[in-house]
Amino acid sequence: MGIKFTKMHGLGNDFIVLDGVNQSIQLTVEQIQKLANRHTGIGFDQCLLIESSQTEGIDFNYRIFNADGQEVGQCGNGARCIALFARYYGLTAKNKLTVATKTTLMDLIINEDNSVSVNMGVPRLAPGEIPLLADRQSPEYSLELNNGNTVNLHAISVGNPHAVLLVENIDTAPVNSLGQQISFHPQFPEQVNVGFMQIVNHEKINLRVYERGCGETIACGSGAVAAAAIARLFYNLSDKITVHLPGGDLCIQWPCPTAPIILTGPAAFVYEGTLLS
């Protein structure tokens, strides 16, 4: 008998979701890489695994694997899918869940319209918490690239590391070429997700994201949170920001720098299947 899976997406950021509560699942890095292949596998940006938790106050463990097979600590779009998955398949009857990832705890609320709000915690700017190799915390950092040029960027952690660059037009931003250079830069010892942010007005930004281990995706929840936090902190944007990504819009609310930042958006089921090998 193979492993049952469900294909889901959040604004086109696509996943396979695996029920590790009712199935015994142990996937290797190589197996995840094969499944992620869009020609010879299923194809996805991340593989999400929900497991039982033995810790009081935590409903489930939420594990996230990038397409390269590496486990990471945060995925906001995936969290929305996990919440709907858990309720749809009867793993819980609750509308408010707490899940534990590799690096953090997340509170998830299923709203009446089936959108999901995700408490992404308080963003962190200290270099050691991102992690970023830097002598001191700064609003902006300069990175020297392989070609000798330098690029200025902001750096932040929202449960996973993000670099955010301000650009005039995201349509012409070199997301893949520059994003890859920054993602693998030695100053980011765990690699980094790279957001290219265009400010539209006081309440809206446009965003494209190069995700570590995936490349550019058409939506990135944690990337939207990171960019909105940077926009609020350093560019005086509103405490409620609409982030427009190629896959659609997310709403980010952050009342003050010491409060948790909240991500709200949709999640969708696509199909069910069985992994045969």
Swiss-Prot record:
Pathway: Amino-acid biosynthesis; L-lysine biosynthesis via DAP pathway; DL-2,6-diaminopimelate from LL-2,6-diaminopimelate: step 1/1. It is found in: Cytoplasm. The record marks 162, 211 as: Could be important to modulate the pK values of the two catalytic cysteine residues. One of its GO terms (biological process) is lysine biosynthetic process via diaminopimelate. Keywords: Amino-acid biosynthesis, Cytoplasm, Isomerase, Lysine biosynthesis. GO terms for molecular function: diaminopimelate epimerase activity. Its main location: cytoplasm. The active site is at 75 (proton donor), 220 (proton acceptor). InterPro entries: DAP_epimerase_DapF (IPR001653). Gene3D superfamilies: Diaminopimelate Epimerase, Chain A, domain 1 (3.10.310.10). It is an enzyme of class 5 (isomerase). Substrate binds at residues 13, 46, 66, 76-77, 160, 193, 211-212, 221-222. Belongs to the diaminopimelate epimerase family. Homodimer. This is Diaminopimelate epimerase. The gene is dapF.
